[in-house]
């Protein structure tokens, strides 16, 4: 038996950075719903009593930035300054300009079809057979724990829960397969009247146990639930939040590499977003087709150039075909130009706010999660 451990974390939809991500993507969705060819790079900053929305947006549409911002904060559940934020009373400031003409000339042609990538950059996609959604287990189950926290908060089963929170899972692996949970760290914002003892019991029984596989839990599993003892001050009252600061939470929890570019607030002409989604689609279909047990894809782009400047693959010794053969399969079955990616996944649709909490991968209903190339790829085996 060869045991190693790996840790990933997730954060709640009420975490300050995730508030910012959701506002940025809600504004993006509102613009794309009216103007699918808009160019959007929307950044959000949140702090006590204040939201600042900035960036570069070129569009024929008008959207009410203030109303959208307040609706997002309300949906998350910040309705009182006592818990760190109040959707009704916070100030909303806007500092939005237009996309640089120097960038636009490399991205668009006269028919407003995308010619080239919106920037240079490198992106990674990853998939493995660890879970039913082809995601690493630590990040997949961390997201599920945080989603469970929000569910019990919003349905009032645990009415003392508040929006901010985060969790961290350390899993034990035996020869590359998850076999047990070593450590659970779970911190949730709460109302002041709940005792620490009652909180710990409720989190363990109502959030953790229903989500995590029973066979992975044992007497050896370590639990750290609100280990400081108190988490009443949270949200933007406790920390400022900024779009794009949770890129590892958004992707693979550190199990795969990351190119550095964030997703939220960016329209699909930005390959930081669309290129990463396409790389995930490639990796997931390769794994599902049986070509590898796990697979990491890297693509890179040059600004104004349509074709990727490079495609590479790593199957970590689990591949059933040589890497050069896999790359040829990718080039044959996947159009990785920005326009090809956008067309295949219908990325001009307003689908992005849902991705801004609980991860961009391993979820139903997202076009880059489809297994639509498996049959064609499997023929190569």
From Swiss-Prot:
Coiled coil: none annotated. It is an enzyme of class 2 (transferase). ATP binds at residues 15, 164-166, 230-231, 239, 245-246, 266. PROSITE patterns: ADOMET_SYNTHASE_1, ADOMET_SYNTHASE_2. Residues 99-109 are annotated as: Flexible loop. GO terms for molecular function: ATP binding; magnesium ion binding; methionine adenosyltransferase activity. It catalyses: L-methionine + ATP + H2O = S-adenosyl-L-methionine + phosphate + diphosphate. K(+) binds at residue 43. The keyword Ribosomal protein does not apply. Keywords: ATP-binding, Cytoplasm, Magnesium, Metal-binding, Nucleotide-binding, One-carbon metabolism, Potassium, Transferase. The keyword Metal-binding applies. Pathway: Amino-acid biosynthesis; S-adenosyl-L-methionine biosynthesis; S-adenosyl-L-methionine from L-methionine: step 1/1. L-methionine binds at residues 56, 99, 239, 270. Binds 2 divalent ions per subunit. It comes from the Bacteria. Its EC number is 2.5.1.6. One of its GO terms (biological process) is S-adenosylmethionine biosynthetic process. HAMAP family: S_AdoMet_synth1. NCBIfam families: metK (TIGR01034). Belongs to the AdoMet synthase family. Catalyzes the formation of S-adenosylmethionine (AdoMet) from methionine and ATP. The overall synthetic reaction is composed of two sequential steps, AdoMet formation and the subsequent tripolyphosphate hydrolysis which occurs prior to release of AdoMet from the enzyme. PANTHER family: S-ADENOSYLMETHIONINE SYNTHETASE (PTHR11964). Homotetramer; dimer of dimers. This is S-adenosylmethionine synthase. It comes from Legionella jeonii.
